[in-house]
A protein has these predicted regions:
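Hydrophobic cores of alpha-helical transmembrane segments in multi-pass inner/ER membrane proteins
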Residues: 1, 70-78, 131-147, 232-241
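Short alpha-helical packing/oligomerization segments
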Residues: 62, 213-237
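N-terminal signal-anchor/start-transfer transmembrane helix
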Residues: 1-19
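Membrane-interface helix-loop-helix junctions at boundaries between adjacent transmembrane segments
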Residues: 55-136
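Interfacial loop-to-transmembrane junctions
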Residues: 243-263
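A generic, lipid-embedded transmembrane alpha helix
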Residues: 35-51, 104-106
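Juxtamembrane boundary at the C-terminal end of a transmembrane helix
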Residues: 267-283
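A mid-sequence, solvent-exposed acidic-amphipathic segment
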Residues: 160-215
Length: 283
């Protein structure tokens, strides 16, 4: 009798292991298809961005082109991170924003801001570096938003919090999205790794802009709102990294710093161009 029970347990254990392996293989195939789909979108979006911005007539840029390029960088980073972490919970949010941003240049075509810059390899490198930094920080900001929602979700489940829009969201359909995200500690680690990489590129972009502004404006340095906001954002991100490494700043406070720093970075160019192009109708 004991032998029969033991054999049944062994069979059940092997069946369970086989089912788990089958689920794992199915999940990996599903992830590969998602990665392939994202790669195709990246190629199409990237070609469109390059053709829209680097034209034979000159460098065409505006807030719509900036958002579209920022979304492309964000999706690229998501695609790279997707090989190492399961970030499917971020996919609907990131793809939704990327689709919206990719069509903005059709409505807001921008304007030629320089006929010389398009022929300068050095300025192209500065331009690409700056926009990659924008996209990386955008990715970090989205992670900060989702981390805030994750944290609020954990608290809301304990006390059934419906006193705020965030509490209502995470108790509703948004909780399904959050369940697909990695644990908070992994999300936080990825976020700070991303910010570290973005800060290095932002440093190069901010200080190389001093030299390449000569191409656009004929002066090595222009002190205007864009310069001030860019330097302020750079200092805020640097302060955030310093506080994280030295005093262990993390969690909700770190997420607030990320969102605040990125908001200032947006004001440096995209915000000002939006006001000029959409509100004031000036190119």
């Amino acid at each position: 009798m004991m032998i029969v029970i033991h054999n049944r347990r062994m069979v059940a254990h092997h069946d369970q292991q086989g089912a788990e392996r089958e689920i794992t293989l199915t999940s990996k195939k599903h992830q590969l298809w998602i990665q392939l789909f994202i790669l195709i979108l990246l190629v199409l979006h990237g070609v469109a961005c390059y053709q829209d911005i680097f034209t034979p007539e000159g460098l065409v840029f505006g807030f719509a082109q900036a958002l579209s390029l920022m979304a492309w960088v964000c999706i690229t980073l998501f695609w790279i991170e997707g090989w190492f972490f399961t970030l499917h919970g971020m996919l609907p949010l990131i793809l939704g924003l990327a689709i919206i941003f990719s069509f903005l240049p059709v409505v807001f075509p921008g304007a030629i801001i320089s006929t010389k810059a398009v022929h300068s390899p050095g300025f192209k490198l500065h331009f690409i570096t700056a926009n990659i930094a924008y996209g990386i920080m955008f990715f970090a900001a989205l992670q900060a938003i989702l981390m805030t929602m994750q944290d609020r979700s954990l608290r809301s489940k304990q006390r059934k919090d419906t006193s705020s829009w965030m509490g209502i969201l995470v108790l509703g359909s948004g909780s399904r999205l959050l369940e697909q995200l990695p644990p908070l500690l992994i999300m936080e680690r990825v976020m700070f790794n991303v910010i570290g990489m973005g800060f290095c590129l932002l440093t190069v972009a901010v200080f190389s802009g001093v030299f390449f502004s000569q191409i656009l404006f004929g002066r090595p340095l222009i002190i205007d709102h864009k310069t001030i906001f860019a330097l302020l954002s750079w200092a805020m991100f640097g302060g955030l990294l310093h506080a994280h490494w030295r005093v262990g700043l993390r969690g909700a406070e770190a997420s607030k710093w990320v969102l605040g720093s990125f908001s200032v970075l947006l004001l440096a160019y995209i915000g000002s161009r939006f006001v000029l192009e959409v509100i004031l109708h000036r190119l």
